[in-house]
A protein has these predicted regions:
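Short terminal alpha-helical segments
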Residues: 3-27
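Acidic, low-complexity, intrinsically disordered interaction modules
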Residues: 19-83
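The feature captures the hydrophobic core positions of alpha-helical coiled-coils
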Residues: 6, 82-85, 89-92
C-alpha cells in the first residue's frame, strides 16, 4: 500500500474503533438528525491522533455502515489493526 492508502486505512479503522467505544453512547435527541448524533458521539475522539481531521463524509460513512456490525466491533482486534497500520506507516 502507498502512504496515502495506509493513512486512509488507519483513519477508517480509527473511525470504527472510536465509534464502537462504549464510554460514549449514540443518543439521538428529539428533533436531531442521525448525522448530528454521530458527530456528537465522535467529537470527544477528534484529538486522538487521526491521520487527518474527521470530515462530514466520514460521519456519513459511519451513518451508512451497519450499526449492528459497528456495535459488535472487536475493540481488541481494532486496536491491534491500528497499531499494525501505524507501524507500517512508520516503516515507510
Amino acid at each position: 500500500m502507498t502512504k496515502d492508502e495506509l493513512c486512509e486505512a488507519l483513519h477508517r479503522e480509527m473511525l470504527f474503533y472510536y465509534f464502537a467505544q462504549r464510554e460514549t453512547r449514540l443518543e439521538i435527541r428529539t428533533g436531531e438528525s442521525l448525522i448530528s448524533a454521530v458527530w456528537r458521539k465522535m467529537k470527544p475522539y477528534a484529538d486522538c491522533g487521526f491521520p487527518r481531521p474527521i470530515t462530514e463524509a466520514d460521519i456519513e460513512m459511519l451513518c451508512n455502515c451497519s450499526f449492528a456490525g459497528l456495535f459488535h466491533y472487536d475493540l481488541e482486534k481494532g486496536a491491534e489493526r491500528i497499531a499494525q497500520l501505524e507501524q507500517e506507516l512508520k516503516s515507510l
